[in-house]
């Protein structure tokens, strides 16, 4: 499926990026207040290991629910905290080794989720309060999360992200489609850069021109937003 092909490519790009970081870059503060680069990728590693193992997934969800009950935090925040805390002993080299090793198993595990399970609804409480199908979580959210954290890492450490229309452009187009569905208003959107494109819905609506990555960052809560750009799209 396309979703798993995109996740395979995203994991490859993530590993390539992390392989090139020096010691100072691993400790660079990201725009996620609780995380430097290493801790951000401990979270991603945890998500990948949960995708590769049903047992690990069940363990993480149980621990996250306990943390939510104990600390009154959203389940998503509790899950991320568990993923980081249980891997915080890993050095950057160990983290990278484990991520490389688990990457193909993650894609295989997620791709084998039965259709009946994919249709099951799961409640989420951040950044929106609604119910998602498990298939949406597996195919869309896990991909967007990895992609945005790759962008976060580049912005924390300097340089430019590796972007292409067939990969990043596809992710951005999917974000635009969901954004349009969530606000339901007419618009004209011109996204620049390798991941960009032109998008129009209806007539007479608001008009935007901006970098494609910046657009996604704003919708993910990583920048100032006004008008239709205040519409939350989960990452």
Residue ranges and their predicted role:
Residues 27-70, 121-182, 215:
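Short, contiguous alpha-helical
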Residues 1-42, 51:
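An N-terminal domain-cap segment
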Residues 202-235:
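C-terminal interaction segments
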Residues 116-118:
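Globin-like tetrapyrrole-binding proteins
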Residues 169-207:
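An amphipathic alpha-helical core segment
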Residues 12-15, 19, 48-52, 100-114, ...:
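Structural signal for well-ordered, non-membrane alpha-helices
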Residues 3-7, 96-99, 139-142, 146:
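Hydrophobic packing residues in well-ordered alpha-helices of helical domains and bundles
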Residues 1-2, 50-105, 111, 120-121:
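Short, helix-capping/interhelical loops that line the mouth of catalytic, cofactor-
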């Amino acid at each position: 499926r396309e979703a798993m092909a995109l996740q395979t490519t995203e994991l490859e790009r993530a590993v390539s990026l992390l392989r090139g970081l020096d010691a100072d870059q691993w400790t660079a503060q990201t725009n996620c207040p609780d995380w430097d680069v290493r801790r951000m990728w401990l979270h991603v590693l945890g998500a990948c290991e949960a995708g590769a193992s049903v047992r690990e997934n069940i363990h993480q969800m149980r621990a996250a629910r306990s943390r939510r009950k104990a600390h009154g935090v959203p389940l998503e925040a509790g899950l991320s905290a568990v993923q980081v805390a249980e891997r915080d002993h890993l050095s950057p080299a160990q983290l990278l080794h484990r991520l490389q090793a688990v990457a193909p198993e993650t894609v295989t595990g997620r791709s084998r989720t039965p259709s009946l399970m994919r249709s099951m609804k799961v409640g989420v409480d951040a950044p929106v309060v609604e119910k998602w199908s498990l298939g949406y979580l597996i195919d869309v959210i896990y991909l967007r999360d990895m992609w945005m954290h790759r962008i976060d890492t580049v912005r924390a450490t300097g340089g430019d992200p590796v972007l292409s229309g067939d990969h990043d452009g596809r992710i951005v187009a999917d974000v635009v489609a969901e954004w349009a569905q969530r606000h339901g208003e007419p618009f004209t959107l011109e996204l620049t850069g390798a991941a960009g494109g032109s998008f129009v819905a209806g007539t007479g609506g608001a008009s935007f021109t901006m970098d494609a990555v910046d657009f996604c960052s704003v919708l993910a809560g990583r920048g100032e937003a006004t008008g239709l750009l205040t519409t939350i799209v989960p990452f």
